[in-house]
Amino acid sequence: MLRLLASGCARGPGPGVGARPAAGLFHPGRRQSRQASDAPRNQPPSPEFVARPVGVCSMMRLPVQTSPEGLDAAFIGVPLDTGTSNRPGARFGPRRIREESVMLGTVNPSTGALPFQSLMVADLGDVNVNLYNLQDSCRRIQEAYEKIVAAGCIPLTLGGDHTITYPILQAMAKKHGPVGLLHVDAHTDTTDKALGEKLYHGAPFRRCVDEGLLDCKRVVQIGIRGSSTTLDPYRYNRSQGFRVVLAEDCWMKSLVPLMGEVRQQMGGKPIYISFDIDALDPAYAPGTGTPEIAGLTPSQALEIIRGCQGLNVMGCDLVEVSPPYDLSGNTALLAANLLFEMLCALPKVTTV
């Protein structure tokens, strides 16, 4: 089930970019439906008329709904870090990402994307996870996402540790069959088990392979790096047909050519984007649980996500933001921007 955010959460669209709200309290209006094509779509409020600190702490200050009905896409928080192996704190990621999203606008001048003129978008609050039982949390996540996907709504997820991608992909595969995967991360997350446990943030994609959730010939992992306990830590991945792009193969270069190859590999079938913030160098994203040096840059992250435009993206997540290690808030700010870029890359988003 989905749970609304803290008290004061309302549902319905906020004031449009060109609309001036009444003086005094900021009150979102009634919910709109995508079925009414001539009806105005939800719009984040313009700072020209509504001060950034004003309103409910939702993603981009969008309306908060309890149901995915009528939505083309939605932001969902999964505040879970029970599966972490090093630094905790990712359970606070969704809240902090939402806080930092107030700086985001409604259009993307760099790509020409007009997401809020193309899609009905809202914030669906958080999945009500069980912090004391990881298996039960995964069940709750899967059930919540099955409802979201069944409604025809594309989920954009605020994590949470990387364990959450496993139940999300269970829900995705239930509707779409095995999906392609663009996985941006410092780690492959295909370890079989740790301390006897097969369910944690280092193993989600191993579990996905075990259950046939992935179209393994359409899995690309970018940004992989770090020390290991073996000299060939990527043998399993390559044996499954994954393409593994190491971080050092990305150093000092544009990733636009790489993403051209990725688009050809993915084709027109459904794909899922899973972005671990530790793919980025800790100079840019220190607030994460398992940082690795010599990572990607923010501009490369933009090239990767923008390179997905035109693909059949059925869902996205941004995981592993740990606010206790993000003293400046820059990691969450970066995460919020990357989620906006994912929204802009979704199918049916108009570009000019």
From Swiss-Prot:
- Cofactor(s) annotated in UniProt: Mn(2+)
Give the domain of life: Eukaryota
Residues bearing PTM N6-succinyllysine: K217
**Binding positions (Mn(2+) 2):** D185, H187, D276, D278
A Gene Ontology cellular component where this protein is annotated is: mitochondrion
Which pathway does the record list?
Answer: Nitrogen metabolism; urea cycle; L-ornithine and urea from L-arginine: step 1/1
Annotated stretches, region: Disordered: 11-49
Q: What is recorded on activity versus pH?
A: Optimum pH is 10.
**Enzyme Commission numbers on file:** 3.5.3.-, 3.5.3.1, 3.5.3.7, 3.5.3.17
Kindly state which reaction or reactions the protein catalyses: 3-guanidinopropanoate + H2O = urea + beta-alanine; 4-guanidinobutanoate + H2O = urea + 4-aminobutanoate; taurocyamine + H2O = urea + taurine; L-arginine + H2O = urea + L-ornithine
Q: Which residues are involved in binding Mn(2+) 1?
A: H162, D185, D189, D276
Molecular function GO labels = agmatinase activity; arginase activity; guanidinobutyrase activity; guanidinopropionase activity; metal ion binding
Q: How does activity depend on temperature?
A: Optimum temperature is 67 degrees Celsius.
Q: Which SUPFAM superfamilies match?
A: Arginase/deacetylase
Transit peptide residues are: 1-35
Record-listed N6-acetyllysine modification sites? K193, K217
What biological process terms from GO does the record include? agmatine biosynthetic process; putrescine biosynthetic process from arginine, via agmatine; urea cycle
Biological role: Hydrolyzes linear guanidino acids to form urea and the corresponding amines. Displays specificity for substrates having a negatively charged head group and short chains including taurocyamine, guanidino propanoic and butanoic acids. May protect cells by detoxifying potentially harmful amounts of guanidino acids. Metabolizes L-arginine with low efficiency.
UniProt name for this protein: Guanidino acid hydrolase, mitochondrial
| Organism of this sequence | Homo sapiens (Human)
Q: Which gene encodes it?
A: AGMAT
